[in-house]
Amino acid sequence: MSHTAEIPLVPGSESPLELKPLKAADPQIVYHRRAHRLLSLAKDSPLADYFELCRRLVSIQAKLAEGADFGQLLAWGKDEATPLSLLGSEADSYWQGLLQQLLSDLLPQVDESIARVVRLLMQQSPEQLSSWGRSLRQGHVSEVPAHFSLFIWAAMGVYWSHWAPMVIKRMDQRKVAQQSMCPVCGCHPVASVIVDQPRAGLRYLHCSLCESEWHYIRAHCTSCGQDKEMTIWSLDDAQAQVRIESCDECHGYTKMMFVENSPSMDVAADDLATLMLDSELNAKGFGATTLNPLLMAHETT
């Protein structure tokens, strides 16, 4: 059972047209939608086997999000800019418990090559898992064995996405400034989403860990913030549902998902399905400033 009664609620506006600086996600809905989208995208993908692995993993996340024991909300930085980034080592036992459940459920669903990785990860010490989890949350992906990152992040995502909505209710959103990293947990975004509510054309960045979304003005670089030298790219036409916004100053880029036109889209699944866009931008000297929880590519800097 979750306990949050000791944290006072912060009053806010009830206007349906007010721009919300920060939006909470329902992890069960997110994971179910993501699993369905992965199944749909796999049909025409050369990465169909990997999409299926991710679908099974995300389906287990949905199951855990619904019925796992998350204990009580631990001490968090309620006066800090990114409150859930400051969870102490006490959180490790909870997400590591989720990791063991996730791996146990996944083990009979995968082939032997992946099963060996799963069994090896299940044998790691709590201290080692804590260290790897901390490195991933800090963006130091290359410090963690690549074959473990996907599963560790998935377990942490279930834990952090469970608590994020409750913490958001208790944050003073008037103090949430435009920023590159998640204002709730401090992690990288997956991509931008362009929505039609409460007003058409608003952009939000979607967190790779806690699944929260925060407003970010369009035509501004989501990494360095400049707004003078920005370029939009797409594979087919200017109205593509997935486009890339690149910065000529810092040479970073982020994808934009126009979910207002295609509600079935999911940031992680559709990012994975459009890796050809990444290849094109990488060849031009640009680098992603985002992180996909289904890919966990090692940083290049």
Curated annotation (Swiss-Prot):
UniProt GO BP: protein maturation
Keyword Nucleotide-binding: no
Pfam family, one: FdhE_central
Gene label: fdhE
Single GO molecular function: ferric iron binding
Keywords: Cytoplasm
Compartments where found: Cytoplasm
Annotated protein name in UniProt: Protein FdhE homolog
